[in-house]
């Protein structure tokens, strides 16, 4: 399968396809990373509220002066970026298509304030299995604000996470009903936005990083190990990449049932740090998502 990215046997095949899609999507909750740099903290306004009855000489109503918002300028991902992936399953000599996944990043207006929105859309089995996720992160890119997932299959469900960065809480709803509250940390990301946070880090040297991630049931320090540089082939093209291996210890879902599960991610070794390949190995087989189409604003 050719890629257009440009750098700067088992018993139940349908169950395996579904596991492939859920496995690739679940890995987003794994991509663990990092406490925020201090300069990305909350911006404070120097506006001072006047005393009652006080009037300014220029007669302007300065009580309406808005708070200054600093919008994070990404180093690697881009506003308007879209990546389309083809997912396949491998077991022994057998290979078969398992589904499609699309990631996107966009700057939006969220309740009158600038925010970052990240989306994931996946499908398999001719549309019988669908998974949509949407993450909203504050303008400074320091904390998640909302996280929505809609899963349609035999176990269809709708999950909403509402983050309160000031109170350091996350409220979870399942199919419209309250489903618990958990504590978070000063800089906490959801299972989808953490993959974009990860791309922003300095991965030039091997090492290990950690960051707070909340899935609505728990907040945990998730770790990722930078293995080093590798060259991979997608279709007939070779790419220079950086291989990273997230720790699956806290990941829920298909990985939680397999202690030997392993996740590997290859990022482009260039200014984009695009996710070129995702590989998950569980007891059912190996699932691989390769970047097939990459769109980025000039």
Locate predicted features.
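Acidic, serine/threonine-rich low-complexity disordered tracts
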Residues: 34-165, 203-298
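Short, positively charged and aromatic/hydrophobic N-terminal segments
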Residues: 5, 11-12
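Positively charged n-region of N-terminal signal peptides that target proteins for export
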Residues: 16-19
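Compositionally biased non-globular segments, especially hydrophobic aliphatic-rich helices
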Residues: 11, 22-23
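Hydrophobic, well-structured mid-protein blocks that either form specific transmembrane helices
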Residues: 158-200
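Hydrophobic membrane-insertion alpha-helices, especially the h-region
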Residues: 23-36
């Amino acid at each position: 399968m050719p890629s257009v990215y440009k750098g700067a046997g088992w018993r139940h095949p349908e169950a395996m396809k579904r596991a492939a899609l859920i496995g690739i999507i679940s890995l987003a909750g794994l991509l663990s990373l990092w406490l925020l740099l201090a300069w990305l903290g909350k911006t404070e306004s120097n506006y001072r509220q006047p005393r009652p009855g006080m009037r300014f000489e220029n007669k302007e109503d300065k009580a309406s002066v808005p708070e200054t918002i600093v919008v994070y300028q990404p180093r690697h991902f881009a506003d308007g970026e879209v990546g389309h992936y083809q997912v396949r399953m491998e077991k022994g000599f057998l290979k078969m298509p398992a589904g499609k996944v699309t990631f996107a990043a966009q700057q939006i207006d969220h309740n009158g304030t600038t925010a970052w929105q990240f989306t994931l859309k996946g499908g398999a089995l001719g549309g019988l299995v669908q998974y949509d996720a949407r993450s909203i992160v504050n303008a400074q890119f320091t904390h998640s604000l909302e996280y929505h997932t809609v899963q349609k299959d035999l176990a269809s469900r709708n999950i909403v996470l509402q983050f309160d960065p000031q109170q350091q809480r996350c409220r979870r709803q399942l199919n419209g009903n309250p489903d618990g509250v958990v504590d978070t940390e000063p800089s906490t990301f959801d299972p989808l936005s953490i993959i974009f946070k990860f791309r922003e880090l300095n991965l030039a040297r091997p090492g290990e990083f950690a960051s707070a991630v909340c899935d609505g049931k728990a907040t945990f320090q998730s770790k990722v190990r930078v293995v080093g540089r590798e060259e991979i082939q997608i279709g007939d093209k070779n790419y220079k990449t950086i291989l990273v291996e997230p720790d699956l210890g806290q990941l829920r879902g298909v990985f939680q049932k397999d202690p030997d599960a392993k996740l590997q991610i290859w990022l482009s070794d260039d200014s984009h740090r695009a996710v070129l390949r995702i590989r998950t190995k569980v007891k059912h087989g190996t699932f691989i998502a390769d970047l097939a189409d990459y769109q980025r604003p000039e």
